[in-house]
């Protein structure tokens, strides 16, 4: 008997194997629902950031509590994304997605009804827990709904439309805060969640069932659930507490100890939260490292560029937000091209191209900061925006395509964990480089050293962080100190951008040595 191998092209496979239940048109509606869920998460991130000053004034909360409105949410995302992905594999991705979506909508409602800073932080933590259940399930459902030849295109839609929502976030947040109430920044998630959840129930996405018995790794859950938050909080707060402080070292050390124990446990249990065998696949390992490095390089860019524009170049907050569009818009519009490129040639060439664009763009951004030229900075931001889709989209699509459909929730959770942890570590390292450079400037420049006592004041500290009210007050009270501060901030952030460019150069080498020149096909279980 002759056995014929399947030698169809990706395009033929797409037509032959998509949703064998005969639900071809519905996969695009499923994609729309999954895209809506991610758009909700990404819009929430930028809208809330704009509303923080108004929230602080309305609820009467101090700066420490205000910062935890953002930090608490990010800690949960970085700490529990892998667990959320595993839950989808164990109990069903559509079920996990539905629970996550309803829970995210409910917690958003409670955030909008918060009566104090502490209650808002608590509901933001709850919001984060439901996000880590919803997001890995949604991306796995997208991959499972499309055949290998169309996954890049589908993931481009899944990631591209939410990117436009994120781009519009500052404008939407500003309008809501000015003409309505900051509470609607959270409440706008509720109708989106209801619509997305309803579509999920009606469309019933397919989900391959596991043949083996499901077991829950309670020991691994406990170790991961304590180790990751300890480590992430220590890294995030190191600039505030001091890198050598007992609190930073103690909490960080405890986190690393717990995570080491987690790795040992995962090698031994029958059904781990994270199957460490995934990392024996060279390309999956490359995809994971790629997301870590990319986020480490880029997370601080938008934050520090906005500070540079306001403190050094005297941009208003509104103008500084608009000035970031050269980086955001190209990313939103090029992601479809990146998706089709992955479908045709795999990850290697798109990632190398994206790495070159990002590294060059960050270098130009640093040069533009040194020369205080927005034109050069804008070109640099544009190159970064062009490069990002060619790196992140192939890494996500390729990584999930290399595992069986029953394990894609776990794969998605692992990839997003690398991405989130990269954000935290990159921001901490680049922030430390900037702080060290600024400290050296304060101690070595005679003109600045003359104002060293003022540099330690609350007003100057808040101005250096981009606080618009503090900036205006400092410029009116002491223009000389404001000019000195601008020089310190400029030199520090320029050094930080060169550090980010150095990080991003690793993307090119990962593309050359760890990725493949063809898209991944579905593996056997």
Language-model features and meaning:
Residues 16, 420-513:
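Hydrophobic transmembrane architecture of multi-pass small-molecule transporters
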Residues 19-23, 197-225, 267-282, 343, ...:
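Flexible interhelical linker loops that connect adjacent transmembrane helices
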Residues 25-77, 161-162, 181, 219-221, ...:
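Transmembrane core module of solute transporters
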Residues 38, 101, 107-108, 123-124, ...:
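A generic transmembrane-helix signature of 12-TM secondary carrier transporters
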Residues 55-56, 87-88, 172-180, 235, ...:
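Interfacial helix-cap and linker-helix signal at transmembrane-aqueous boundaries
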Residues 81-220, 246:
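Helix-loop-helix hairpins in multi-pass membrane proteins, especially solute transporters
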Residues 151, 190-209, 225-236, 255-269, ...:
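C-terminal membrane-cytosol helix-exit motif in multi-pass small-molecule transporters
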Residues 159, 165-168, 377-459:
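Small-residue-rich alpha-helical segments with characteristic i,i+4
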């Amino acid at each position: 008997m002759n056995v014929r191998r399947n030698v169809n092209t990706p395009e033929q496979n797409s037509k032959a194997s998509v949703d064998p239940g005969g639900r071809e048109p519905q996969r695009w509606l499923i994609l729309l629902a999954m895209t809506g869920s991610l758009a909700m998460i990404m819009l929430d991130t930028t809208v809330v950031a704009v509303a923080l000053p108004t929230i602080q004034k309305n609820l009467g909360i101090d700066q420490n509590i205000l910062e935890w409105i953002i930090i608490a949410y990010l800690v949960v995302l970085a700490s529990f994304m892998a667990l959320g992905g595993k839950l989808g594999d164990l109990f069903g991705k559509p079920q996990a997605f539905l629970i996550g979506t309803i829970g995210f909508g409910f917690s958003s409602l409670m955030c909008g009804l918060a009566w104090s800073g502490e209650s808002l932080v608590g509901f933001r933590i709850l919001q984060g827990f439901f996000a880590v259940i919803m997001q890995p399930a949604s991306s796995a459902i997208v991959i499972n709904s499309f055949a290998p030849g169309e996954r890049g295109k589908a993931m481009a839609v899944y990631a591209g439309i939410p990117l436009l929502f994120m781009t519009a976030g500052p404008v939407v947040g500003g309008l809501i805060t000015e003409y309505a109430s900051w509470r609607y920044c959270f409440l706008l998630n509720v109708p989106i969640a209801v619509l997305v959840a309803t579509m999920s129930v009606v469309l019933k996405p397919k989900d391959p069932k596991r043949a083996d018995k499901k077991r829950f790794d309670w020991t691994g859950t406990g170790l991961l659930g304590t180790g990751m938050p300890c480590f992430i909080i220590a890294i995030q707060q190191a600039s505030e507490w001091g890198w050598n402080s007992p609190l930073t070292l103690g909490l960080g050390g405890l986190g690393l100890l717990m995570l080491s124990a987690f790795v040992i446990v995962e090698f031994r249990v029958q059904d781990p939260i994270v199957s460490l065998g995934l990392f024996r696949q060279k390309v999956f390992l490359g995809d994971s490292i790629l997301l870590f490095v990319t986020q480490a390089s880029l997370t601080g860019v938008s934050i520090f560029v906005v500070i540079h524009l306001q403190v050094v170049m005297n941009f208003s907050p509104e103008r500084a937000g608009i000035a970031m569009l050269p980086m955001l818009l190209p990313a939103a519009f090029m992601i479809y091209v990146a998706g089709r490129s992955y479908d045709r040639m795999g990850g290697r060439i798109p990632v190398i191209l994206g790495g070159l664009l990002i590294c060059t763009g960050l270098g130009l951004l640093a040069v533009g900061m040194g020369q205080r030229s927005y034109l050069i900075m804008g070109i640099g931001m544009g190159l970064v925006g062009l490069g990002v889709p060619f790196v992140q989209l192939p890494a996500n699509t390729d990584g999930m395509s290399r595992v069986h459909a029953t394990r894609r929730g776990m794969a998605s959770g692992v990839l997003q964990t690398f991405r989130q942890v990269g954000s935290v570590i990159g921001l901490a390292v680049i922030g430390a480089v900037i702080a060290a450079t600024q400290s050296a400037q304060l101690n070595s420049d005679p003109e600045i050293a003359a104002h060293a006592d003022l540099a330690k004041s609350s007003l100057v500290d808040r101005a250096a962080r981009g606080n618009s009210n503090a900036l205006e007050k400092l410029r009116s009270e002491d223009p000389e100190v404001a000019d000195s501060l601008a020089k310190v901030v400029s030199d520090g952030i320029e050094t930080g951008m060169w550090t980010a460019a150095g990080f991003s150069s690793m993307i090119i080498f990962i593309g050359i040595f760890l990725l493949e020149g063809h898209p991944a096909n579905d593996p056997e279980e």
